[in-house]
Swiss-Prot record:
InterPro entries: RALF (IPR008801). GO terms for cellular component: apoplast. Residues 1-26 form the signal peptide. Disruption phenotype: Longer roots. Its main location: secreted. The record marks 68-69 as: Required for proteolytic cleavage. Proteolytically cleaved, probably by S1P, a subtilisin-like serine protease (subtilase). This is Protein RALF-like 1.
């Protein structure tokens, strides 16, 4: 009785696991010389190539996304700052973008707090 219950419980758990897992197809790919995997469930990414191809495509997408975000920024480094052995603005306290006499280096104002040790 005890052995049959253990066998029944094991088979029930196995059937539940098989039913709940997404279907996966595996086949031999002649052109790649290996096994190609593709998920066919709703949770799959839709990639039907080898694992390396799917991961490679994902990495290319991330790379282009990072490059797009970097290029979309408005901050830039001027050509003058990129020249060898040159200082962008030699005036002490002046902004690199507004290197003029009396130009503010930091045009925004902060509130006074204990940590800033400002004098009132």
């Amino acid at each position: 009785m005890d052995k049959s219950f253990t066998l029944f419980l094991t088979l029930t758990i196995l059937v539940v696991f098989i039913i709940s897992s997404p279907p996966v197809q595996a086949g031999f790919a002649n052109d790649l010389g290996g096994v190609a995997w593709a998920t066919t469930g709703d949770n799959g990414s839709g990639c039907h190539g080898s694992i390396a191809e799917c991961i490679g495509a994902e990495e290319e997408e991330m790379d282009s996304e990072i490059n797009r975000r970097i290029l979309a920024t408005t901050k830039y480094i001027s050509y003058q700052s990129l020249k060898r052995n040159s200082v962008p603005c030699s005036r002490r306290g002046a902004s690199y973008y507004n290197c003029q006499n009396g130009a503010q280096a930091n045009p925004y104002s902060r509130g006074c707090s204990k940590i800033a040790r400002c004098r009132s």
